[in-house]
Amino acid sequence: MNNKSSDSKNTLYCSFCGKSQHEVRKLIAGPTVFICDECVELCMDIIREEHKTHLVKSRDGVPTPKEICKVLDDYVIGQFYAKKVLSVAVHNHYKRLAHSQKNNDVEIAKSNILLVGPTGSGKTLLAQTLARILDVPFTMADATTLTEAGYVGEDVENIILKLLQAADYNVERAQRGIVYIDEIDKISRKSDNPSITRDVSGEGVQQALLKIMEGTVASVPPQGGRKHPQQEFLQVDTTNMLFICGGAFAGLDKIISARGKGSGIGFGADVQSPDERRTGAILRDVEPEDLLKFGLIPEFIGRLPVVATLEDLDEAALIEILTKPKNALVKQYARLFQMEGVKLTFTDDALKQVALRAIARRTGARGLRAIMESILLSTMFDLPGLENVDEVVINKDVAESKTSPVYVYGKEKPAEQSA
């Protein structure tokens, strides 16, 4: 008993989380306090997050494009061209706002952006990351929910209302904000030929978006919708708002290919089958006429002068997405297994196989979670009922669904046993 009490007296504890020296890997001693490695790591994460939210400013007090791009790099893998376009656009937006109060002969117009890229290439993630790091009001809207005024659905003014809410109803701040409209390709005109039926969720929405994207004084109901007819409307000027629109534009690559260089004939012709060029490579050749054929009206295309295309994610990029970001999928599943007291290990060959399966599905990064779920489903089903499992190893054969994962047991059971 005396030995136990003396041991407990000699045991050191973290002054922050209270864990003992036996529960952590490292305990660092100060003059009168101790801190464990887990608390140090947590403090570093907090410092990094605060550093990212305070971007380096240029001479005019405007975030530099390189600094914005660097922060985007921490969250989004690849897509350097799209990051470059977004960084410059946001930088110029800040500059316009910084100089808008000065009396200048030249009025700088805003350059709204259209992001075009295959599904799962990172369009929405880029916008979400911008929202995290910017110090101007930012809102995201879904174009699929919008309808023309007078029909069931959301009015375009609701987008301005969301921005107003993001600015805590400060109209001055909201007027200098950034709006991201996702799934913009879903409001394309349903047919090249005018129809006798009204297209309230397609061309009608494009027409309604024109004025707020160009710059107008919108009347916004503070409580939203039409349920409160007696409410007073807020007047919001959209002239200084930056609009970023994004969409997958499924089928646009076929329109571009059809317009393209045509079918070459003769010995010197450069003949390439459509399958040889990936969707992202074809989308790089997009022209306004292609967007017109897709179903966007000319006036709407004119409001989006900057078009940035995103690439298909290759094998190396998908492997980085699996492992590199702070919330990478491998880290997420490793944490789930850690809750069971088990270490989860993926071999390099296994990660490569997961990336190849995602490429074959043509779903980009979005398909990675479904593949990981299918690989780990049986293991996650069996593991809570197993005892003394130290580690689960996922190799190439497991990733190809040829064999079951390898279970590494503790001392009580043989390590070579597998399920």
UniProtKB/Swiss-Prot annotation:
GO MF terms, alphabetically ordered: ATP binding; ATP hydrolysis activity; ATP-dependent protein folding chaperone; protein dimerization activity; unfolded protein binding; zinc ion binding
PROSITE patterns in alphabetical order: CLPX_ZB
KW tRNA processing (keyword) present: no
Residues that bind ATP: P118, T119, G120, S121, G122, K123, T124, L125
Assigned keywords, A-Z: ATP-binding, Chaperone, Metal-binding, Nucleotide-binding, Zinc
CDD domains found in the cross-reference section: RecA-like_ClpX (cd19497)
InterPro entries reported for this sequence: AAA+_ATPase, ATP-dep_Clp_protease_ClpX, ATPase_AAA_core, Clp_ATPase_C, Clp_protease_ATP-bd_su_ClpX, ClpX_bact, P-loop_NTPase, Znf_CppX_C4
Gene Ontology annotations for the cellular component aspect, listed alphabetically: HslUV protease complex
GO biological process, one term: proteolysis involved in protein catabolic process
Residues at which Zn(2+) binds: C14, C17, C36, C39
Residues of the ClpX-type ZB domain: 2-55
Keyword Chaperone attributed: yes
Domain of life: Bacteria
S-S bridge residues: none
PANTHER family in UniProt: ATP-DEPENDENT CLP PROTEASE ATP-BINDING SUBUNIT CLPX-LIKE, MITOCHONDRIAL, ATP-DEPENDENT CLP PROTEASE ATP-BINDING SUBUNIT CLPX-LIKE, MITOCHONDRIAL-RELATED
HAMAP family: ClpX
Family to which the UniProt record says this protein belongs: Belongs to the ClpX chaperone family.
Function: ATP-dependent specificity component of the Clp protease. It directs the protease to specific substrates. Can perform chaperone functions in the absence of ClpP.
Summary of subunit composition and partner proteins: Component of the ClpX-ClpP complex. Forms a hexameric ring that, in the presence of ATP, binds to fourteen ClpP subunits assembled into a disk-like structure with a central cavity, resembling the structure of eukaryotic proteasomes.
Descriptive protein name: ATP-dependent Clp protease ATP-binding subunit ClpX
